[in-house]
Amino acid sequence: MTNDPDAELIEAGRKLFAGDWQFFWASPSIETLPPMQGIEIALAGRSNVGKSSLINALTGRNALARTSHTPGRTQELIFFKGPGPLDAQTPELRLVDMPGYGYASAPKTKIASWTTLIHRYLLGRANLARVYVLIDSRHGFKDADDEVLTTLDKSAVSYQIVLTKTDQVKKSALDETMAAMAEKLRKHPAAYPEMLVTSSRDGAGMAEMRAAIVKLLRERA
């Protein structure tokens, strides 16, 4: 039995995501959201930033969340649920795969519909504990990301930046991106101060992200 709190969180995170995760609900509109139960954590980001791949990597399941190379494919809020509360201090978790934003080639009416759905969900979901805003480390921060962070700043929702696809950039370039992101976040005081650095392809950062989620769940218990 370890007394290292970080090691304990990592082990708890491993157990949480090693359970039976499955698709639970799809909501094309705010009116069709599932009943609020447990704690929800949402993944937001530009189209093709790697939200579905990250969910698959976190849960260790290659096809839990459907991935696509076609930007804008996810058009609904997709809910996934785990096996239930991990223990007395760690409540039930649901993951939410949100429609990608910033896909300019989609029809304007569809973009407007996605935007409305995303914003209404972010502002009106009492059991939403945190939004992980995914940023493609190859491309960095874009105007569409800034708009979403501004929306989150105006809400009561905690959010944190997750850099994705870090296996595809050199360390020097990644360091530059992280420095630029840190500077950007100075303008967004509601952002969680630490960034998560991940790769769904090689698993980098997954243990740390699972541990961070367990810590958050316990804080909300």
Swiss-Prot record:
One of its GO terms (molecular function) is GTP binding. Its cofactor is Mg(2+). Residues 37-219 form the EngB-type G domain. Pfam families: MMR_HSR1. Mg(2+) binds at S52, T74. The keyword Disulfide bond does not apply. GTP binds at residues 45-52, 72-76, 97-100, 164-167, 198-200. One of its GO terms (biological process) is division septum assembly. Necessary for normal cell division and for the maintenance of normal septation. This is Probable GTP-binding protein EngB. It comes from Afipia carboxidovorans (strain ATCC 49405 / DSM 1227 / KCTC 32145 / OM5).
